[in-house]
Amino acid sequence: MKEPSIDVKHIATLTGHSGCVYAMDTGFSEQTIFTGGSDRYIALWNLETLQAEKFSAALPAAIYTICHIPEKNILLAGTTTGAIHILDLDKKEEIKILQHHRGPVFDIQYSLKTNCFYTAGGDGNFAVCSLDTLSLLIMKKLSYDKARSIAFNDVTSEIAVALGDSNVLIFDLFTLENKNDFIAHQVGEKVVGANIVRYSPDGKFLLTGGRDAHLNIWSVENYELIKSIPAHNWAIYDIAFNPDATLFATASRDKTVKIWDAKTYQVLKRITKLNFEAHTHSVNKLIWSTYRNYLVSVGDDKMVMIREVNRK
């Protein structure tokens, strides 16, 4: 059976950040995205005009993660100091700062099912906060290493959290009962950090990326390893599915983005400096937009890169 092929077209490279770009989330509409990074600024970009929008927020520390919650019209930004800045997008002002982490905030995600947002920190803590009061509800110490990434399975109502000690913990979304935990990445006998967790949109698989440069596929039914792929040359930092869930992309410290078939887990395209306009440094974050199937990547080279991906 012939492997499906895809076309990747470079649309634009957007410049404006003066430091590494670590954070990205969807914007006010499908054609806008927020970005943030070491220059301490949050920018808003338009994927249609390929220009920066008239929006800018300056924070007192480098930004590792941003989370746009359109239902509340707020933007959350986690920084290297452990602060979570909450911006009211209607009022265009900061309305609150949460400081429950004692290390950098690596990830912020939210769930309308629980009306909460969730944060993962370099202090090994995982926190649950109310979307109504914007205050801390629960704090769990998960590791003496970092808590790096959070993912929701909407089908099974589970939360996965990736830890720097290589463990991935699975919690019940509503009760936070620990349902499973396993070592996700190791090289021989040595365990290495898990950087990113991402559920497949159908809820059947959990994908993890680690410091070992491997992409691991786990069955959600029992969290047993189905496949381990030496996907990159350096650590994997992000995984993003395309809108129809037939493809996914991985981003790595090795400066590349790779596009994979979501059924066969075969690599379909390698985006490197050899064959594309590509990042010159670590690629940190991906968004696969519903707008024209654009795959957006950001990295340590300060660039926001936009590519259109279509099946041939």
Language model features with spans:
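Conserved strand-to-loop turn within each blade of WD40 beta-propeller repeats
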Residues: 36-39, 78-81, 120-123, 162-165, ...
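WD40/WD-repeat beta-propeller blade N-cap
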Residues: 14-21, 56-63, 99-105, 140-147, ...
